[in-house]
Regions:
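Short loop segments at secondary-structure junctions
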Residues: 83-84, 190-194, 205-207
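Non-heme Fe(II)-dependent double-stranded beta-helix
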Residues: 2-76, 82-173, 215
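Conserved hydrophobic/aromatic beta-strand scaffold that supports enzyme active sites
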Residues: 78-80, 185-189, 202, 236-238
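Residues that flank catalytic or metal-binding motifs in active/ligand-binding sites
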Residues: 126, 155, 182, 196-198
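Glycine-rich, charged/polar anion/phosphate-binding loops
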Residues: 171-173, 187-188, 232-233
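Double-stranded beta-helix
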Residues: 196-239
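Short, conserved beta-strand element in jelly-roll/cupin
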Residues: 179-195
Length: 239
């Protein structure tokens, strides 16, 4: 650490301060990526501390959602609802989403194109059904509970096209952990997704910080080198 400070005092100070933030990149942060510190349990501590703080906040938010949803999340790490909306409301929402012209951006990763259309404040002015749904307490309370605090989510209409070219598989299909701290993502599917069309996959119970999970976090943090895959080096551990 002394050598790191002497080499670049300002970077060392900034990297050290990032320990108390959501920063996760092992390659961009000299402190987070320090192998000796991670052998001593730095990454493991950050994982445990973040989970404890999230659990405390969720305990205060649980009253805003159904007890069955709380139970499912605590057991599985996610909340799954079929027919989340009434048939008529869902039909109106789907019709509005599929017929409203939206600015589109897309990314190409491996053999997969992901196309997203932002549902921001400007767009939602012309989409009353979608706006009502995204702002509803029924939807927001679930997001807040899983995230463990009142969030300002970024919402998109998303379409994924798999196997569009001969290339390596989409790296997002590799089982992975997005980051070291609890986070929230949510999907309302407009169509059923077949097994060969890239359905969302989550390992039930993988959010639990049992000894096996903590040992995995520890081992991954210790093993990161310049040859480790880029997503893991950036803090999104691949399984």
């Amino acid at each position: 650490l002394g050598k790191m400070f002497i080499h670049s005092p300002s970077k060392f100070i900034l990297d050290s301060m990032a320990l108390f933030t959501q920063s996760k990149s092992f390659e961009a942060n000299s402190v987070l990526g320090n192998s000796r510190l991670n052998q001593l349990g730095l990454h493991r501590f950050r994982v445990q501390f973040a989970a404890q703080m999230a659990a405390q906040r969720r305990s205060k938010l649980a009253k805003f959602i159904h007890p069955a949803d709380v139970e499912n999340f605590q057991k599985n790490g996610f909340i799954f609802r079929e027919n989340f909306l009434a048939a008529e409301e869902f039909s109106q929402l789907k019709q509005e989403l599929l017929t409203t012209p939206l600015e589109t951006r897309e990314t190409l990763q491996g053999d997969t194109v992901t196309r997203r259309m932002a549902l921001d404040g400007k767009t939602l002015k012309h989409m009353p059904v979608t706006r009502q749904f995204l702002h509803s307490a029924k939807w927001r309370n679930l997001l807040n509970y899983v995230a463990s605090f009142k969030v300002q989510p970024i919402s998109y209409l998303q379409v994924i096209f798999s196997h569009v070219r001969k290339a390596k598989a989409d790296p997002q299909t590799n089982l992975h952990s997005d980051t070291f701290h609890p986070s929230a993502k949510a999907w309302l599917f407009l169509e059923d997704v077949a097994a060969d069309e890239g359905p969302f996959v989550y390992v039930p119970g993988s959010h639990l910080l049992n000894p096996a999970r903590l040992n995995w976090e520890q081992q991954k943090s210790e093993a990161i080198t310049a040859k480790t895959d880029v997503m893991t080096r950036r803090g999104s551990f691949r399984v």
